[in-house]
Every structure is written in C-alpha cells, then in structure tokens.
C-alpha cells in the first residue's frame, strides 16, 4: 500500500504533494517528470522489498508507465499466463504484472484482476493517463479537474498541496451531506472541482487536449432478486467456506509480517480463525473499552484462548479520545464523524509495532447482510408489505420531538436503513446557513442504487455496499491505518465472495431473516454459537466520551475550517 500522485501542470509542486502523504509510503519517495505529465510515488514496501519493486515503473521501451496503490490477489496466476505469452519480468511485484497485463490487453486488463487498487497508467502511444479504481472502493483515488488542469492523488491533502496555484473553494453541498450522514458521499469531496473516482470505474484523460474523455464503469454486480430458497444449504456452506479460505490465504501473502484485527464480532472472528489456520503464528490485535456496554473483548479473548492465538490488546479510554480528537484532522483531511475512527487508529498503532499488514472483517455486514436495520425492515415487509411512507412519518415525528423523545431517533436510525440515510434534525437551519437550494435532495446520490424490485434485506445490502461502505467504513479504515503506515486488507470483499453472496436468493443468504445466517451456519462449530448468535454491537466508542449530547458531526463541524489544509 502506498501513496500515488500525478498531474499535467508544470507549475505544481509534486514534491510537496507526495511528501505530505509520506505516512502512506515511508520506505521511499520518487517523482518522475514525463512529456506532458508527472507521476509521484511514496512506497510502503510489501511485495518485493528490493529496488525492482519501486515506482513509477515503466515498460521495457519506456512508452508506458504506472503508479499503483494497493494489492492484486492471485497475481501469480496472471503472471504465469503473461510469461507464456512471452513477457519477461524483472521483479516479483504485482505492479509489474499490472503493467504487462495492460500492454497485453489494454484497458480490459482490469477485468482480469482482483484486489484493492488505485492505478494510474501513462501511455505515450495515445498520450493519455488512465485511472482505475477497485470494484468496491477499498483504495481511495481523488482527482482535480477545472476544464484543463488535471491531477490525482491518494488523499485530498495530496491534491491540495500539489496544486499550489489553485484557490480551493469549499463545496457547501458536501458540508450539508456530511451533517446529515456523517461523511461526504462519493464522488464528492470537501472542495469544488475535486472528486473521487467512483468504485469500479475507469477514467481517461487526454494529455494533448487537456480533457477527460471517459469516466465509466467497468464492472456491474449482478444481484439475485429472488426471495425463496434456491439451493441446498450444505452445498452453499461448502462453496462459501472454500471462497473465504481461498480469499484469506491469497491475502496472507506478503514479504512482511501479517496479522489480523479481532474485535470479537462475527466477521473478524471468522477472518482471524481462517488466518490462524493458514499460519498459526499470526498475531491478533484487539481493543477494549472502559464501558462494558461497548465491549466485545471477552468474545475476542475466548476465541484467541480456544485456538492459542498470539493476542495483543489495549483499552481505549476517555482520555485517549480527548488526546486523539484534535489529531483527527491529520488522518482525515475532510470532515468525517464516524467515532470508530479513534479505536481503529489505536489498534492500528498497536499492530504496526509488530506487523506491516493486517486482515480485517470489514465488509461482512454489507456482503452477507448483518446490520440490525435489515432485520427490522424484513419484519416490517413481511407484516405489512413495502412501507416506504413510514420513513416520512417517523422523520416528521423526530423533527417535532427531537429534544423530548429519543425513541423516535432510535426508530429513525433503524428505519432509515431502507434508504441508507440518517438525516440530521436541523435540516432547515443547515440549508439556510449553507445557502443550499430548496431543490437539493441529499438522497439523490442513493437513488441510483435503489432497486425497488429487490427483497428488503438484499435491497439494503446493495445500497450500503454502494454508498455507506466506500463512503464511511473503507474511508475510516484506510485513513486510520495508513496514518501509521499499516496496510489493511479486507478478504470478505474479494470479487468472488461479493459476487457469490449477491448471486444467492435472500432466503439462502439470510434464512428466516437471520442476519448473516449462511455465514454463521458455515462456522458454527469453529467459532461457537455464543459468538455468532448474539446481538450485534458494532465497533464504536461510548457516547459518554463526548462532552454533551451533540452529534459527532456537530462536534467536528465546530472545527470545520481547520480542514483548510
């Protein structure tokens, strides 16, 4: 995992841009000027630690160059295929495999790889720069475009520091979105003219004409709209376990030490169990909280003790929160209010002392159906059929009673899962202060992923997979872990696993409405029913850590101008 950056303006400061992302790549920095474009790279050495794995990397004739952030899984098979076609390799890195795959198949190479990636390819043969982002949005990729000047970077701060001739203007609609859903939804960023390349998308920039000629999707997830049982559960369990095992074994490959995050929840327990099977010396890292209502630590400890795992742990306290709160702007260069970012940073900091790579359970809820609001909507639909108007009823009641009745707020949090949005109650005031047009509707970015004909749980899973997962969860993990130069991998988000789960009927995936029912059944004996079949807690900090009852986004909003880098 690394930091990448590039642009077409010769006056920009590429050294400053890449230096501010050194935390993403402390093992070396390189800037390369090319005709019409510049690439920069900050390296975190994971595969092929030698100089041969350094980037930017170029083809044998120097016509094509690449900078790449992420990992390609199972790339050895692709490498063998390319060697049979006559390609020679001078490193053991996956970067060189991508480069030669592009030379062989052009832009279609991206359909042949699986992994987490943000890729930029410079091609003198047609004088273009092509960007590619992984299917789920695991790796970030920002770009700036004003109609002629174009640049990209792994983080927003890279864009801002590189584009030293630009006066950046805050996008008030992004602030408005943030105040409603606690993060800035893709493709927006905090600033106008700066965007994020959407997951599963490619972009082509014409260097000569200084314009973006393509921004399109290269992958479409097929979703099963059936509700009833279609396949025998034993067959599904066998296939699921094979895919989980395969994904974890592929993602354990590295030339540096690998560990796992173990929260005690369903997903991290399964990932850690399979990682331990692959390597009994794997280190696990866990967080505990002083408030037992937020602690799952005893479940993590139980699993670690059962399999004699190497467990490392730390307690996250209120003083830790106070200490790290003001540092949040260092990790997230735009407003972000997911409070689990704090313990994620601390567990990453602890892990980095022993390993360079960790596997996490992120994505399991979206892929296998694990959020509590899914179950509520499943029950509502079974009782009453589709009940979309219920959202409006609850929303109106919350606005009237927000200071009196916290039941309505809890109800809204659950019911909002149907759309995947959690509106803040000060909407009218926010619109006024931010000068937001009356016609602007925050839900527009989600409507493109709202598929009415899908069963309730599947519908919500798909929405969250496309919005909440890349916008919040994966952003949180990437920034918190990379702040300490730790690579996080997410085996439950492999292409094969995502496509497998969404190819199932809802009943096969969540039998009788049991959240993650198939996944839990597959690991009952190894993980234990007491860990698998209990109320979901989530990975968040106690609300008592805040000074008052303001929402996290309002706490962070008071410092919003500090995000002007």
Locations of the language-model features?
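Adenosyl-5′-phosphate
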Residues: 1, 108, 167, 193-194, ...
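Short hydrophobic/aromatic residue motifs in ordered secondary structure
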Residues: 28, 140, 268, 364, ...
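Short catalytic/ligand-binding loop motif for oxyanion handling, primarily in non-cytosolic enzymes
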Residues: 128-129, 139-140, 160, 366-370, ...
């Amino acid at each position: 995992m690394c930091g990448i950056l590039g642009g077409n303006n010769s006056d920009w400061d590429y050294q400053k841009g890449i230096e501010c992302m050194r935390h993403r790549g402390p093992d070396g920095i390189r800037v390369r000027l090319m005709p019409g474009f510049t690439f920069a790279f900050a390296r975190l050495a994971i595969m092929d630690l030698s100089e041969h794995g350094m980037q930017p990397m170029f083809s044998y004739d120097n016509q094509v160059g690449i900078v790449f952030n992420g990992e390609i899984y199972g790339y050895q098979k692709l490498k063998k295929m390319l060697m049979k076609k006559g390609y020679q390799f001078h490193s053991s890195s996956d970067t060189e495999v991508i480069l030669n795959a592009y030379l062989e198949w052009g832009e279609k190479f991206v359909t042949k790889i699986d992994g987490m990636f943000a890729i930029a390819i410079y091609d003198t043969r047609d004088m273009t720069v092509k960007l590619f982002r992984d299917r789920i949005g695991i790796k970030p990729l920002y770009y700036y475009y004003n109609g002629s000047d174009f640049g990209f970077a792994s983080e927003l701060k890279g864009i801002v520091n590189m584009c030293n001739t630009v006066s950046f203007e805050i996008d008030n609609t992004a602030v408005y979105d943030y105040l409603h859903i606690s993060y800035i939804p893709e493709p927006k960023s905090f600033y106008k003219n700066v965007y994020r390349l959407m997951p599963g998308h490619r972009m082509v920039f014409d260097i000569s004409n200084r314009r973006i000629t393509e921004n399109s999707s290269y992958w479409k997830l097929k979703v099963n709209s059936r509700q009833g049982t279609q396949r025998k559960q034993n067959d599904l369990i066998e296939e699921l376990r094979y895919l989980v095992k395969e994904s974890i074994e592929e993602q354990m490959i590295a030339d540096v030490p690998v560990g796992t995050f173990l929260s005690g929840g369903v997903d991290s327990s399964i990932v850690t169990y399979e990682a331990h099977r692959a390597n009994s010396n794997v280190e696990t890292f866990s967080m505990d909280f002083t408030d037992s209502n937020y602690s799952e630590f005893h479940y993590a400890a139980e699993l670690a003790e059962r399999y004699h795992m190497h467990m490392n742990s730390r307690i996250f306290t209120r003083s830790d929160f106070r200490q790290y709160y003001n540092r949040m702007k260092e990790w997230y260069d735009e407003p972000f209010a997911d409070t689990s970012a704090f313990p994620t940073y601390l567990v990453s900091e602890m892990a980095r002392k022993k390993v360079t790579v960790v596997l996490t359970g992120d994505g399991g809820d979206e892929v296998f159906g694990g959020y509590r609001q899914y179950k509520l909507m499943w029950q509502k639909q079974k009782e009453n059929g589709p009940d979309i108007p219920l959202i409006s009823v609850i929303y109106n009641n919350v606005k009237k009673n927000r200071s009196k009745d916290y039941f309505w707020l809890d109800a809204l949090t659950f019911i909002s899962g149907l759309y995947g949005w959690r509106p803040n109650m000060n909407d009218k005031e926010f619109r006024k202060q931010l000068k937001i047009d009356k016609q602007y509707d925050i839900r527009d970015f989600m409507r493109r992923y709202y598929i009415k004909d899908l069963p309730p749980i599947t519908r919500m899973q798909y929405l969250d997979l496309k919005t909440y997962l890349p916008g919040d969860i994966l952003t949180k993990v990437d920034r918190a872990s990379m702040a300490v130069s730790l690579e996080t991998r997410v085996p439950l988000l492999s292409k094969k696993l995502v496509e497998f789960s969404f190819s199932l009927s809802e009943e096969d995936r969540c039998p009788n409405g049991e959240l993650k029912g198939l996944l839990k059944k597959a690991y009952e004996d190894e993980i234990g029913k007491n860990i698998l079949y209990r109320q979901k807690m989530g990975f968040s900090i106690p609300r008592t850590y805040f000074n008052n009852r303001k929402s996290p986004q309002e706490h962070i909003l008071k410092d919003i101008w500090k995000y002007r880098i």
